[in-house]
Amino acid sequence: MRRWYVSDFTLREIKQLDAGSWFNPKFKGARVPTFQEAIELMRGKAGLYPETKAPEVYGRFGFDMERLLVAALRRNHLGTRRAERHTPVIIQSFSPESLKKLSGMLNPKLPLVLLINEQMRTRWLTPAGLLEMKQFATGIGPAKALLDKDAVRQAHAAGLSVTPYTFRSSNTGQFKTVKEEMGYYLYELGVDALFTDNPDLFPREP
């Protein structure tokens, strides 16, 4: 099976895709928004949490993802001193190099979160790795299965926030409900925030 990249298509072609049916039939016909359209939809209502996704891959195709992202933010006065206060911006990436690049480009600085999967665990979820990360990031976003109280404590000791992923009702592991699972991570392990597909089930502090 051939692997396709976004850069293989024009925006007009991408806009023909059905982006909603895979999630729920009631969203059939939903179109893929551009980043600009997402900004216009969310401005003044909620924050933005963009991810530089596979930036090294697209870099080989001639796309400077970090430069394009920063240009879009500045064009919309986001992440600047003139920014809409109800639309804070946090940038996430699995790429340490991408965050390092962004750290040098952003003025004023924005929160930068290094996402961490199982393969990255031994490199970054250690006291030494966390201290190194502090040089270019403000937080970690690990897969939820990688966290325990000690890992959260070490990250906080290094001055990093902790935002695990992804909490959804279809995958709650040992917990009966996603609400119970989110409550455990928030109020037992002490994470600062979390990524969830079910914000409507977000638990309140007991």
Report the location of each language-model feature.
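Paired acidic/hydrophobic, glycine-rich loop segments that form the ligand-binding mouth/hinge
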Residues: 47, 194-195
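A structural motif
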Residues: 137, 190-191, 199
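Metal-dependent phosphodiesterase/phospholipase catalytic core, i.e.
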Residues: 1-124, 128-131, 135-137, 142-147, ...
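C-terminal helical cap(s) of enzyme catalytic domains, especially alpha/beta-barrels
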Residues: 199-206
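C-terminal soluble interaction/assembly domains
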Residues: 145-147, 155-189, 196
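Short glycine/proline-centered loop/turn elements that form peptide/ligand docking sites
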Residues: 150
